[in-house]
Amino acid sequence: MYVAIAGNIGSGKTTLTEILTKRYGAKAYYEETDNPYLGDFYNDMSRWAFQLQIFFLGSRIKQTVDMLSTGDENIFQDRTIYEDAHIFADNLHKMGLMTSRDFATYMKIFELSTNLIPKPDVLIYLRASIPTLVSQIKRRGREYEMNIDEGYLSRLNEKYEYWINNIYEGKLLVIDKDVDDFVADPSIIDRICSQLEEITAQK
């Protein structure tokens, strides 16, 4: 069972990944954060946006190929290659930080790559309102996230909703984090596991 977990910054992807990997005795695959372009990007976003996103895309492709070649029965991936393209690269393009030519090139590479790797058996989407995201970001206390702009989170939420409702074509499990706090109520994890197994059993 290959399960990928998607959602905005602060939605609880890493926490859910950790919980599910313990439940299934599986290995977790987390987002690559060591990007050599990150410092340059924050100093000059429009100059380095394309290189930043291409590096993340390449890292995600390699991670996906490597993890699927292990033959492990259960695999859980924190954030997906689809979010790189449809959420973050698209947002940089819409903000004018990535040129249309660079974005078109990026999407060609993305489309070629995703045609060569399988979709997750189930994509879990953690839907969360801005107040929930902000609360969880503050609770985990990462210094570089403490002043994150709520307008930025809102734009990303809009892109996530559009992607989930209009673009993504695989099997999907949506969890409303405003209602289902699986940290406060562990019984919700039992329900999520049952839903995962039901969905993967479907032909």
Can you say where each PLM-predicted feature lies in the sequence?
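Hydrophobic anchor at the beta1->P-loop junction of P-loop NTPases
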Residues: 5
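P-loop (Walker A) phosphate-binding loop of NTP-binding proteins
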Residues: 8
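Conserved lysine of the Walker
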Residues: 13
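Post-Walker A alpha-helix
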Residues: 16-17
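Conserved substrate/cofactor phosphate-moiety recognition/catalytic segment
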Residues: 22-59
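A glycine- and Lys/Arg-enriched "phosphate-lid" helix/loop adjacent to the NTP-binding pocket
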Residues: 87-159
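NTP-dependent small-molecule kinase module
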Residues: 134-203
